[in-house]
């Protein structure tokens, strides 16, 4: 078992060294866009822990507000989608992903997602905030109500 664990650790480090720089660059670009330039650089370690450059120092993700953390996790997930599926021909699915976003952050995020060229965006929510934000921005969408 110890030998297997060592092999897994080595493979994880190898994957991170190959994939890590591109992932860091993509997450950093996305978080800069999502936060309106507030955060410019993110570092993702080989265990997918996130640290953000505040301009003065690097801060662990858990020291940031819940809304900012959620934006970081969104950027991480979408950066992985972009890097693993560069043609963007896969749908992206969100299931109550924006419950910790304030209205301004929600509107900016929905507009940003719409600008990314994903083939299809599926958004599950138990709230009307997302629909209200899309309507205010004049974005077309097709609601499907589940019972």
What are these regions (language model features)?
Residues 1-35:
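Charged, surface-exposed helical/loop "interaction arms" that form contiguous linear patches used
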């Amino acid at each position: 078992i110890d030998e297997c664990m060592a092999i897994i650790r080595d493979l994880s480090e190898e994957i991170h060294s190959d994939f890590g720089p591109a992932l860091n660059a993509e997450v950093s670009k996305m978080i800069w866009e999502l936060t309106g330039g507030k955060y410019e650089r993110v570092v993702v370690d080989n265990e997918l822990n996130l640290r953000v450059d505040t301009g003065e120092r690097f801060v662990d993700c858990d020291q940031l507000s819940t809304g900012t953390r959620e934006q970081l996790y969104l950027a991480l997930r979408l950066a992985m989608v972009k890097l693993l599926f560069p043609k963007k021909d896969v749908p992206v699915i969100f299931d109550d992903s924006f419950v910790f976003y304030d209205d301004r952050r929600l509107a900016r995020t929905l507009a940003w997602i719409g600008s990314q060229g994903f083939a299809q965006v599926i958004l599950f929510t138990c709230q009307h905030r997302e629909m209200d934000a899309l309507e205010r921005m004049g974005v077309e969408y097709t609601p499907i109500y589940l019972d």
